[in-house]
Amino acid sequence: MKPFTLPRWRFTNCCGHHWGHPAKPAAAEGATRREFFKTAAVTAAGLAALASEVKSAAAQGRVFPPPPPSVSPIEGLIDFHTHCAPDAFGRAVDDDESAQAYMARKAEAVVLKNHFALTADRAWLVRKHVPGIKAFGGVALNGPSGGINAEAVQWMWRMQGGFGRVVWLPTFDADNHVKHFKDAPEGIKVVGADGKALPAVRDVLKVCAQQKLVACTGHASPTEALAIIEAARDAGCDRIVVTHAEFEVVNMSVEQMKKAASMGAKLEIDALGVLMGPQAHLPFMRHWRHVSYKESAGHIKEIGAQNFVLGTDLGQTGNPSQPDGYAMLVSGLMAEGINREQIITMGREVPGKLLMG
């Protein structure tokens, strides 16, 4: 193998002395001219290709992810619907980790939801461990809580700290849910044969009215949710939310949303919606219909931002973090024509009044 040599220029001064790299044997004049033109052609082609690449790169714009935003897109907002460990289902983070992540993004508050266990006590612990953020909890009236159980609600709001502010009517155990997904022959009913809210539901709503708790419709059908809203008004409960109104099992029409809003209910929009559908990366989410940002933005424009509340419904193992999901929801809605003022209304003002008003 020949040793590596680096070619250098050879200089000759006016006296004929040489220095630099030894000269190669002189080539014939014709060969020298051919090599010159060959080299020039190759160089010109290379420069042209380089110029083309530079122009192409310029046309493509940035090739790196954008820098972190100077202002957090979720600063001051409230996530009205989070799921954390410990739970019966796989959760990516626990309550404290979720709160810390939200505090780092300058969010205002989080609502801790669990389908099977109380979260009013967990909210107190989060506030103790992560004092920079407000945490709220509540109770979901599924089987483990005794179903539609006013007594469970009474003890929930009495939990130390007073941070148990939300009551979810049946979710996974709801009659509408189990029949829709064929999980069981029947579940916990919220309305009778006459289509009216059952007495047990009315008892729960009376407690919500007395203690200024937020009543959420859970996984009730659209017609059931409207019956619950009517019963809430009769009971004097003016803090009522249609749980993820756009999602599968609930899936209200625009007209039903308008009616619910006219009766004083707020409609929940969640970041999880855009991740669901046949294209979902997690198998369980393929059974729920896809809700696009465009669809949600259309509902906001038609019904009014003052009638909506934002959340994520995130926390599942394998899904985006709750703060990232919330930021995606905000940017997705704004890309569809929703302005920052409307985001503040839905993400801060409306849930703030429900929880702390």
Task: Label the predicted regions.
Residues F36-F37, Q60-K134:
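An N-terminally biased module of ancient metal coordination in phosphate/nucleic-acid-related enzymes
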Residues D270, I303-Q322:
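Short acidic/histidine-rich active-site segments
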Residues M1-T32, A58:
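N-terminal secretory signal peptides
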Residues P25, E29-K38, G46-V63:
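N-terminal twin-arginine translocation
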